[in-house]
A protein has these predicted regions:
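A solvent-exposed interaction/effector surface
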Residues: 1-160
Length: 160
């Protein structure tokens, strides 16, 4: 379900309310400040595990959860029936409504969009964030995609 909401005239910062299907992410936690563009080895560790166990065809999505400035969970949704291996963990997110901004371009553009989402859109929306971390949903791999073609959803889970 998608409903556009009033927002800035810049279509790159249009906020929509979507219903996010349940996610079960096998994630590896990055500890220490790190720009998104440098998280490749963290995502790569999960991908290597998936490849060595024949799970790459099960990938439903690529996700990141910025927990705070020094902790980031990077991983993949393989569906609900896999267990996390040693050194990784499961992140389960129930079905929820989210405020979504779809971003096109370099990851450096995410910070201004987050500032708008939290500082501009959220206060005027009448909504409150749920007790679930912000979610990054990545649509392509920065190792083989030009920066200008990167697509990332910023998903802010909302209280019902």
């Amino acid at each position: 379900v998608r409903r556009p909401l009033p927002g800035p005239t810049d279509s790159a910062l249009r906020v929509e309310i979507i219903t996010l299907a349940p996610l079960t992410i096998i994630a590896k936690r990055r500890v220490g400040a790190c720009p998104i563009r440098d998280l490749g080895p963290t995502f790569g560790a999960v991908w290597s595990w998936a490849a060595s166990n024949g799970h790459t065809t099960r990938v439903r999505g690529i996700y990141g959860l910025p927990l705070d400035d020094d902790h980031y969970d990077a991983g993949f949704d393989f569906g609900p029936d896999l267990a996390a291996p040693d050194g990784m963990h499961l992140v389960r997110i129930d079905r929820c409504e989210c405020a979504q901004i779809r971003m096109h371009g370099p990851y450096e553009n995410l910070e201004p969009a987050l500032d708008f989402l939290y500082g501009g859109w959220l206060p005027q929306s009448g909504r409150e964030p749920a007790d679930v971390p912000l979610i990054h949903r990545f649509y392509n791999d920065p190792d083989n995609t030009p920066e200008s073609d990167l697509v990332t959803d910023l998903l802010l889970p909302l209280r019902v």
